[in-house]
Amino acid sequence: MSRTKFIFVTGGVSSSLGKGVTVAALGCLLESRGYTVSLQKMDPYINIDPGTMSPYQHGEVYVTADGAETDLDLGYYERFTHSKLTRKNSVSTGQIYNTVIQRERKGDYLGRTVQVVPHITNEIRNRMYIVAREENPDFIIVEIGGTVGDIESIPFLEAIRQMRYEHGSSNVLFVHLTLVPTITAAGEAKTKPTQHSVKELLGLGIQPDILVCRVSQPMTKEMKNKLSLFCNVKEENVISASDISTSIYEIPKMYKEEKLDEVVLKTMGMELRESNFSEWDKMVKGLLTTKQTVQIAVVGKYISLQDAYRSIYESLSHGGIAHDTKVEFIKVDPENLNKDSYVEILKKVHGILVPGGFGDRGIEGKILAIQYARTNGIPFLGICLGMQCAVVEYGRNVLGLKDANSTEIRPDTEHPVISLLEEQNDIEQMGGTMRLGSYPCKVKENTLSYSEYKSILIHERHRHRFEFTNRYRKQYEENGMIIAGTSPDDNLVEIVEIPKHNWFIGVQFHPEFQSKPTLPHPLFAGFIRASVKYSKKG
């Protein structure tokens, strides 16, 4: 473990308080003081990973460079910090039990009774120590998923209790994020739920060092004093986390003003280095003082759930930051698009994005949206399934392949312009078996994609089973849709474009997983630039 210190963030009273953003914001603040950080998520569900979960259950699946399908919180971690995360940074109960059971079957436990303590808790700790050994950061900030009191979280809480006992308070810090609700009828904030949450933690042997309190209004000194007294936490260690209505990228600034990073460093006996927060501060100011607004239609089957396309929305905002532009999202359910409605729904937008997804629900609505973008010169970005739908639309309406489709949607189609990757043919298991992670892509010069990337070789993250069918490549290129990017061996189509269009790009990969507010992805920056230009046509 060497010099690495551990910060554990738990949650109490309620779920969805923003532990992931708090972890990311703290990482951002510590990096601004010159410390190196790594971030890790412990998920208490029994799934191995979220790859087969419905977005309605879990939100988006965030893909790391090494191909791990992870919680969307890892997206916050990478966007807020300089960390390059891998599968080691995402741990689930399912992974832990799977490892322990496999060892038991191999006889590694020498006939002993395998139990939650010590075997499960030891494996949980081991996952943290692996990150410490391999990355050797100054800090590892670990988010413990779920809410204190949940039965699923108990082994993780026991593991971090043991770590505090073993390594001491100067090396292990506990941060508890909790809710201080305001009762409208009484007109005051109530600290009792937080007191009970801390009492629950104390019963598990964990004394929080820092309380981060979600409140609708900034906490008064009296409230902080009360929580300090009843929760056995220093008053200066009670942090007010007020609701922010503008942008999540203001959250590090809010925590900085509350001196969260200073409290962490002081409590752990670390040097309070000078903070260099200027780049982040400049980005936030630019985000809040935009000169213009564009409306972007996001056409996706899970559109009713904000978290289903979290990285898409954030990346579009990053593109807006690059051009002093506020991006308004027009969320379109493709099932509401038909030949009678699609023009009315889409006529006021300045750009159309169709994100990734699976299955046939809403496919025809997506194809109608793409047709509208193509025929009206509206900037279009298709991602993964969105790119595949663009290929299908072009085949049907330009090439005259009336039955054109993906074999995912219609296995017996006469013109399978999108088909299963050859490597997927013999795969029976669903979880973790797609083409996952970062792969190189060769970009053709003198294309729109090249003008955006300004590079011949790029690396992008993938999550798919289907691809452009190569035997149709010549027919498409001869009729106006070009192949702008392929795998280095030229076997897989990665990017398609329509050169005669204002801005029309479809990509097989997921560029949203590599965009940051301080470094917008070139495709999103280019898409928003084109949308701004389109908006000024009148």
UniProtKB/Swiss-Prot annotation:
Matches recorded under Gene3D superfamilies: 3.40.50.880, P-loop containing nucleotide triphosphate hydrolases
EC identifiers of the protein: 6.3.4.2
Listed GO CC annotations: cytosol
Binding-site residues, Mg(2+): D73, E143
Amidoligase domain: region residues: 1-270
Record comment: activity regulation: Allosterically activated by GTP, when glutamine is the substrate; GTP has no effect on the reaction when ammonia is the substrate. The allosteric effector GTP functions by stabilizing the protein conformation that binds the tetrahedral intermediate(s) formed during glutamine hydrolysis. Inhibited by the product CTP, via allosteric rather than competitive inhibition.
Binding-site positions, L-glutamine: Y56, G357, L385, G386, M387, Q388, E408, R465
Catalytic activity line of the entry: UTP + L-glutamine + ATP + H2O = CTP + L-glutamate + ADP + phosphate + 2 H(+); L-glutamine + H2O = L-glutamate + NH4(+); UTP + NH4(+) + ATP = CTP + ADP + phosphate + 2 H(+)
EC top class named in words: ligase
Record-listed CTP binding positions: S15, D150, I151, E152, K190, T191, K192, P193, T194, Q195, K226
Binding site for ATP: S16, L17, G18, K19, G20, V21, D73
Keywords, in A-Z order: ATP-binding, Glutamine amidotransferase, Ligase, Magnesium, Metal-binding, Nucleotide-binding, Pyrimidine biosynthesis
Subunit: Homotetramer.
UniProt family annotation: Belongs to the CTP synthase family.
Role noted for this protein: Catalyzes the ATP-dependent amination of UTP to CTP with either L-glutamine or ammonia as the source of nitrogen. Regulates intracellular CTP levels through interactions with the four ribonucleotide triphosphates.
Protein name: CTP synthase
This protein's encoding gene: pyrG
